[in-house]
Amino acid sequence: MAAAAMATVAVPRVKLGSQGMEVSAQGLGCMGMCPAFEPPKPEADMVALIRHAIAAGVTFFDTSDLYGPHTNEVLLGKALQGGGVRDRVELATKFGKFFAGGKPGIRGDPAYVRAACEGSLRRLGVDCIDLYYQHRVDKKVPIEVTIGELKKLVEEGKIRYIGLCEASASTIRRAHAVHPITAVQLEWSLWSRDVEEDIVPTCRELGIGIVAYSPLGKGFFSSGAKLVDSLPDHDFRKLIPRFQPGNIEKNAEIFERVNEMAARKGCTPSQLALAWIHHQGRDVCPIPGTTKIENFNQNVAALSVKLTPAEMAELESYASNVHGDRYPLMMANTTWQDSETPPLSSWKSE
């Protein structure tokens, strides 16, 4: 599949959830453009990539006030200036996860929610955020309280749609009862499928769209085990159990099998992994991240890869025995498995 052909794949539009939001069938995750522990990528190159994406039909951009921190939103804001660009894109950002004094924190209290939104609006240079996610659930604050403040921001015209990240099915239900949730962002890929049992069916029952982050297994399905050798010293992926010695060697076999199938299909392993996500349904939008136009073009080309039910089953069989968890133990309390909040009756506002 030639690079020139990759850039010409038509990107469909899809409904994200049932509240009226429409996005490109594949988005662009922007986190890697401003790595937390490395120098940022050249701004001009990243702006060029974002504008290339828009020209190619990918208009759904994902960022967060955590990334940088803050600099990722500033970068995206610059890329969307001028020429009516803002009106052509769907802008998603997040709040609630931060570092203070070198330590991670999570907040979802009303005052923090409002201040975070105002900060993101300012950095992005926009009047309204299309999709505003709670980046991680604050287990100290009833989810009804957090969503209640987000509902006010919708009513004030500062955000259009509300989303959650890494939330359990019960938390999603409680949130949705306060104000309709448009999308839930979760890790979903060939080797991260635990959300399929409860969360995905809950979203579909409630008419909530699904945004799949890390659809390439945090880069694993792009280059396999050799990815680990190329990671900078401070890259957090070096802490992930799946990439640790003892596990990565066993997981390498998964990549080799996927790579063999990709060769038969005339595509790359990363395109095959993305195609698998696309075949989960039109209510699922993956947001692979990249900092290179060449890789972006390859990712978009995944939209043209067709899989039969037998091929889907074959792919899934390759990744049925993954070695190692998707997050290190110190981050396990920030996943959907540990995202329950106190009952609303326990809340005493300050």
UniProtKB/Swiss-Prot annotation:
At which positions is substrate bound? H135
- Its top-level enzyme class, in one word, is oxidoreductase
Query: Where is it found, in Gene Ontology cellular component terms?
Result: cytoplasm
Amino-acid positions noted as binding NADP(+) in the UniProt annotation, renumbered to this chain: S214, P215, L216, G217, K218, G219, F220, F221, S222, S223, G224
Q: Report the SS bond pairs.
A: none
Q: What is its EC number?
A: 1.1.1.-
Question: InterPro entries attached here?
Answer: Aldo-Keto_reductase (IPR050791), NADP_OxRdtase_dom (IPR023210), NADP_OxRdtase_dom_sf (IPR036812)
Q: Where is the active site?
A: Y67 (proton donor)
Q: Does the keyword Nucleus apply?
A: no
User: Does this UniProt record's set of keywords contain S-adenosyl-L-methionine?
Assistant: no
Which keywords, in A-to-Z order, does the entry hold? NADP, Oxidoreductase
One GO MF term on file is: aldo-keto reductase (NADPH) activity
Hey, which family's this protein in?
Belongs to the aldo/keto reductase family.
Family matches, as PANTHER family: AFLATOXIN B1 ALDEHYDE REDUCTASE, ALDO-KETO REDUCTASE YAKC [NADP(+)]
What is this protein's record name? Probable aldo-keto reductase 1
State the organism named in the record.
Oryza sativa subsp. indica
The major lineage groups are: Eukaryota, Viridiplantae, Streptophyta, Embryophyta, Tracheophyta
